[in-house]
Amino acid sequence: MLRANRDIKSKRLITSAIIVVIILDLISLYFFKYKNQHLSISNFDLSNKGNLFNLIFSLILIVEIFLYLHYKKTKYQTGILLGFTLSMTLILILAQLFVVIKIPLPNYYILDHSLRDFIKVILFSSFQFVQFLFISYLGLSLLRTKELLFTRSIVNSIAISILLLIYAFINLYGSKVADLNEIKNKKNNYVGVVLGAAVWPKNMPSPSLASRTDKAYELLKKGIIKKIQLTGGHAPGEMSESEVAYKYLINKGIKPDDIWIEKRTASTNEQIRFIKSNLVENKNIRNIIVISDSYHLKRIQEICNFFNIQIKVVASDLSVGSENRIYHKTKESIALAVFWFFAL
C-alpha cells in the first residue's frame, strides 16, 4: 500500500513537471516570436492565428497528459513521457540558440533560401513535429492502441502537418485586395511599397519584380499613390532588388524624387518590419499599399497583423502557368504555416 502511494505521488510529480515544462516551452516560443521580430512582448495578441495555434496544441498536450495520468487502463510509461518532453524542449532551445548565436555558414541557397534560413526552419519544424508526435502517441495510448503505436503516431503526425498545410493553402485565397477606385476618390497620400523579388543575370528584373514594379508605376500614374517605396537587398555579385527596380522605373520616366529606396532587407518579414519602423513609426505614414504577387498577399496581411500595422494590398499582374501557380502556392502555404507557428 505504501509503495503504491509512493508510485502515485511519483507519477503526479513527474506529470506536474512535464506540464510545467510544456507551459515554459510555450512561453519561451511566444517570447522568441516577438523578440526575433524586434517587437516587445507587449505587442502579444492571443487572437493572432499563429499564437492561437501554439496555445491550442499545447493545451491539447496538457489535457492528454492529465488524462494519461488518471486513466487506470493505460500503463504509465515515465521514460517515454520524459523522452518526448526532453526532445521537444532541447530542439526548441537548439533552434533558438541557432538564431541568436549566428554561427558562420557557407553562402549556399536551398529552394531560394539561404542555408541559415533553411536550417532554422528545419529546427523549429522538428520541434513542432515532435509535439505532434507526442500528441498522437498519447491520444492513441488513451484509445488503448497497442499495435504499431509509434508507427501510427508518426503517420498521424504527418497527417496533422498535411492538414495544416492544406488549411494554409486554402487561406491564400482569403486575402482582401484594396478597392483602388475608393482609394482614388478619397485622395489620400498613399505610399506604394514594392516588395523585392529575384534579380536575373545582368541585373535584369525577374518577371515577378518587373510585374510588381509595373503595378507601382501604374498606381503612381493614376494618382492612387504619391510615392513609391522600393525594398529588397541583394545576393552576392548583383545589384540589390530595389536598385534594379529603381533603374527600371527611371527608364520608364518616373522622377527620382517620387521614389524611395531601401537596400538591406532580405525577406518579407524584414520588409514588413521596415514598413513598421521606417514608414509608420519614423515618417508617421498611415496610408500604405503593399504591392506583390497575388499568391503572396495573404502572408503579407498575416505578417502585418502580427506587427499590428494597417495596410492595403494590391496584386501585380504577373501571369503564371497552372504548374507554376501550384508550385508558388504550395511554397507560400509552407511559408505561411511557418510564420504562424514561429514568426519566421
Regions found by a protein language model. Give the residues of each.
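A structural signal for short, hydrophobic/glycine-enriched beta-strand patches
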Residues: 172-329
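Extended hydrophobic blocks
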Residues: 2-188, 278-344
